[in-house]
């Protein structure tokens, strides 16, 4: 959401090894034409360059982001690094491969794709943490997890005591 043009691009803000989609989300106005979360084209900026080039990536976008993160930590395992991994999951329009949403179709949930996106994210996060362990760097890596999409499935406050907020 910070902009697609200089001086607001990731490479203008100090990031040296970047894979990103343009605009606020995959498939939005200034993103690469035809991106739909699967087998998309994203901009890659390689270390030592400032201008990126568009590159086709295979797979689901969240899998791509984590695969690139694992490539990055593997390449930088012997020196201090900062990895900023901002995914679009779970976020509308809630697209995910059917095998991730399928287990939630049997449940009484209003959006199985939302929960499928979370399951896919959790799987990928586990792979990344395992990679840190396999590389022997988990004990010297500060790992922060933050999210801003927790209410995307809706808010349920009926079970809470909201009497103080009623006035």
What are these regions (language model features)?
Residues 20-25, 106-110, 156, 166:
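Short, Lys/Arg-enriched charge-dense amphipathic segments
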Residues 17-20, 81-86, 119, 142-146, ...:
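Structural recognition of the beta-strand scaffold that forms the well-ordered cores
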Residues 26-50, 126-135, 144, 154, ...:
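Substrate-binding rim/cap in mid-to-C-terminal beta-strand-loop elements of soluble/periplasmic
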Residues 5-14, 93-98, 130-167:
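Histidine-centered active-site microenvironments of extracellular/periplasmic hydrolases
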């Amino acid at each position: 959401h910070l902009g697609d043009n200089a001086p607001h691009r990731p490479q203008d803000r100090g990031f040296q090894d970047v894979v990103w989609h343009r605009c606020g989300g995959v498939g939005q106005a200034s993103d690469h034409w035809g991106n739909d979360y699967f087998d998309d084209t994203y901009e890659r900026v390689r270390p030592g360059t400032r201008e990126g080039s568009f590159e086709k990536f295979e797979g689901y976008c969240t899998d791509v982001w984590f695969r690139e993160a694992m490539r990055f930590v593997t390449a930088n395992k012997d020196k201090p690094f900062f990895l900023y991994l901002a995914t679009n999951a779970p976020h509308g329009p809630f697209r995910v491969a059917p095998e991730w949403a399928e287990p939630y179709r049997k449940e009484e949930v209003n959006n199985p794709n939302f929960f499928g996106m979370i399951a896919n994210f959790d799987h990928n996060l586990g792979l990344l943490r395992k990679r840190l362990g396999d590389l022997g760097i988990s004990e010297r890596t500060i790992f922060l997890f933050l999210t801003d999409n927790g209410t995307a499935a809706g808010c349920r406050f009926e079970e809470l005591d909201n009497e103080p907020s009623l006035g």
